Amino acid sequence: MAALCPYTGSETTSGIGLAAEGVTPAPIRYGVDRGGGELTGLMRSFWAETEFMLSAGQEGCSSVILSAPSWDESWAEWYGLVFPLLECSVLSAGLGRTLGIVCFHPDYSTPDAAYLARHRFGHMHSTERLRRWLAEADPPLSDRTDDSLLHWAGSYQRRSPHAMINVLWAEQLEVAETKRKSKVLYSRNVAKVLQAGLVELERQSALERTDRP
């Protein structure tokens, strides 16, 4: 994940390279949900970690990575229940302009454009949008990449050994988007993933899942 994010300097620090925009690199906080696969337990874990981040402020905590291993085998529920519930919870708390949420999963697969039009929160950009960006940024690569491979390359950017919720500062996300346009960043990441290759990356992912605690 850090290899695809230009602002994550290591597994412990994020916000790298944004000092000119007023962002101070700060620690990444890691947490683990022990809710046993229950939505109520997951939400308690999410808000406990988020409250720590809010209390620490941007200089004390750059982001939160909350692992939820009990949800590793429940991709359908992860995007069908957890994503929408997180959205409602954050918006109900009046923090929609304060926090950015990104969700990861071992089996992440970007939903279709129709679903994303209703439930964009936390998801990867649609394959259709990635196609437009890639066609602008790297026409030759776009021409030789079919839709199924592009969908995989986009989905792979949200794969992780465990189900995971990444909590970020919305203000810092906006600064990052201003510094590096989305179409450039995501096209670069698609190229990296495609260069590594589907077979090799899926092999590495399988090993990560085997080794996870």
List where the protein language model places each region.
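Expand to "…catalyze enediolate/carbanion chemistry for C-C bond making/breaking, isomerization
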Residues: 1-213
